[in-house]
Amino acid sequence: MNYPHPIIAREGWPFIAIAAVVALLIHAVGGFGLAWPFWLLLVFVVQFFRDPPRAIPTQANAVLCPADGRIVAVETAHDPYADREALKISVFMNVFNVHSQRSPVDGAVQKVEYFPGAFLNAALDKASAENERNAVVIQTGAGHTVTAVQIAGLVARRILCYVRAGEPLSRGQRYGFIRFGSRVDVYLPKGSRARVSIGEKVSASSTILAELPEQP
């Protein structure tokens, strides 16, 4: 599959460069015995910013998982960004997960809203309403509305979003990044059927999160 992004995310290049320079300088001055923790840190930073290509399911009504991580919520909830009752599915990313976000569906971006907030543990339910977050509301060609919300966490304090209202999105398309541990909430139309359960490990784009109903 042709993936139009480097396998090490561009968002991490400055951090990797800094970690490499520090490790090299300390190694040059004090040898490996002194520098090994910094080499270990470099390895950690490189693995954190990995961004591998993924197989993308082609099932027509499938909603794909927007992020790597673990399912922490599957529930009926109010979607405050599209003002409706919805099926809410939440994915928590720890520091060892890939942290790019990918579109769960094909569609057009209806709006993008950023909200400043706190930096609570993203695994907590209240993080959805209280933490810094960025919501992307997407309308599919069939008329379904899907909301994906990037949420900052205890360590993650930098949400990056690369789409604007009116732009098209393809399922599996990379549209954002959150640095160092975070959460993504997905709100789906009532009648959608969840294909995941709480505690399940999921992968961005390759895991089917839910199935949309036949009619919007």
Swiss-Prot record:
Its cofactor is pyruvate. Transmembrane segments: none annotated. The record marks 181-182 as: Cleavage (non-hydrolytic). The keyword Transmembrane does not apply. The keyword Oxidoreductase does not apply. The active site is at residue 182. It comes from the Bacteria. It is an enzyme of class 4 (lyase). It catalyses: a 1,2-diacyl-sn-glycero-3-phospho-L-serine + H(+) = a 1,2-diacyl-sn-glycero-3-phosphoethanolamine + CO2. Is synthesized initially as an inactive proenzyme. Formation of the active enzyme involves a self-maturation process in which the active site pyruvoyl group is generated from an internal serine residue via an autocatalytic post-translational modification. Two non-identical subunits are generated from the proenzyme in this reaction, and the pyruvate is formed at the N-terminus of the alpha chain, which is derived from the carboxyl end of the proenzyme. GO terms for cellular component: plasma membrane. This is Phosphatidylserine decarboxylase proenzyme.
